[in-house]
From Swiss-Prot:
One GO BP annotation of this record: chromatin remodeling
Entry protein name: Protein mlo2
Known role: Not known, interfere with mitotic chromosome segregation when overexpressed.
Any single Gene Ontology cellular-component annotation: chromatin
Length: 329
């Protein structure tokens, strides 16, 4: 029988499922099975949970893993990297609901700092960030870690257009340049922030030009260590592909190998889909999970004989399943 647009062998079906799995791994490249709470205070990717804020009345942020494993169906704001922060999942700041990964409720991080970013608002304009409608580039201040619109930076820069993004590596916002002027002394002991309030646009090697005297180094180490050395950023380990079975390329091999791949691939795909962040179709995923066993049993004979699966075969499978379901009511 010649294959049509509606026909495929089980092996081809499995290959299609494996491709979907690879695409899912590209969306979620990191493992999300470990909460960072026990690691203490880190510079790490964070997500503010607005849903838990409404319930607890407290600002919060959760780590990458918890944003997926514990807060996937909540209203989250991507805060990107924030320094010296301990995950708030499973604390009073997230309504004292146990973390799904730690299975516990613990004390919230007393050293965590919060600003208007944790409410979903950014920049001196205090605008709610919407990634779907946001236009233009935003830049993060190396000191306060707030994000600023290019047009707003220009306003604080006496109306002068900011330098091309390719010409600087770091931003110090106008408020921080004024607040931390004494931390930004050059080798002549003059503040690189100048005397007027304005943003600073620093090169990658700006630290080499800061004052090296013992007093200045001590001050920076004590209050602004990010001016001394670039901070390490925690990243979750990459999700391994151990769960992806190797396809048997030899069609003459026993169909049992393909049958095993079907089962393995279905489990892998379901596992990834079930854990995708903020997926709105969870009910469909769970329904598909219940179908796995029946569908595997149905496809096994096709796999063993390397037969094509037609659209009619699949339709008959679901019609029969529907008939049985009605008889059981």
């Amino acid at each position: 029988m010649e294959e049509t647009a509606h026909e495929l062998t089980v092996k081809q079906y499995v290959e299609q499922q494996r491709e979907l799995e690879r695409e899912a791994r590209e969306v979620l490249p990191y493992s999300f099975d470990t909460c960072t709470y026990s690691m203490g205070y880190l510079k790490q990717p964070l997500y503010a949970c607005l849903t838990c804020q409404k319930a607890s009345g407290s600002l919060n942020a959760v780590c990458y893993s918890c944003s997926i494993s514990c807060h996937a169906d909540h209203d989250l704001v991507d805060l990107f990297n924030k320094r010296h922060f301990r995950c708030d999942c499973g604390t009073t700041r997230t309504h004292s609901i146990p973390c799904n990964l730690r299975k516990s409720v613990d004390e919230c991080g007393s050293e965590n700092d919060y600003n208007h970013n944790f409410e979903g608002r950014f920049c001196i304009c205090d605008t709610v960030y919407n990634p779907e409608t946001e236009e233009g580039t935003m830049f993060q201040c190396i000191l306060c870690e707030d994000w600023f619109h290019e047009k707003c930076l220009q306003k604080t820069n006496k109306g002068i257009a900011i330098p091309d993004a390719e010409t600087f590596e770091w931003l110090v916002c106008s408020e921080c340049s004024e607040k931390y002027r004494d931390h930004l002394l050059n080798q002549k002991h003059e503040s690189i922030a100048g005397t007027e309030r304005a943003p600073l646009f620093l090169s990658e090697n700006f630290r080499e030009n800061l004052c090296p005297c013992e007093s200045c180094i001590s001050l920076r180490n004590l209050e602004m260590p990010m001016l001394v050395a670039e901070e390490p950023i925690y990243e979750p380990p990459e999700d391994s592909e151990d769960g992806i079975s190797e396809m048997n390329e030899d069609p003459s091999e026993s169909g049992e190998m393909i049958e095993q791949v079907i089962s393995s691939t279905m489990n892998d795909v379901l596992r990834i889909l079930d854990r995708l962040p903020r997926v709105q179709a969870n009910e469909s995923v769970y329904a598909y999970n219940r179908l796995k066993s029946e569908l595997t049993d149905f496809l096994t004979p096709f796999a063993r004989e390397n037969r094509v699966v037609t659209k009619e075969d699949i339709s008959n499978f679901f019609l029969e399943r529907s008939r049985i379901s009605k008889n059981l009511r």
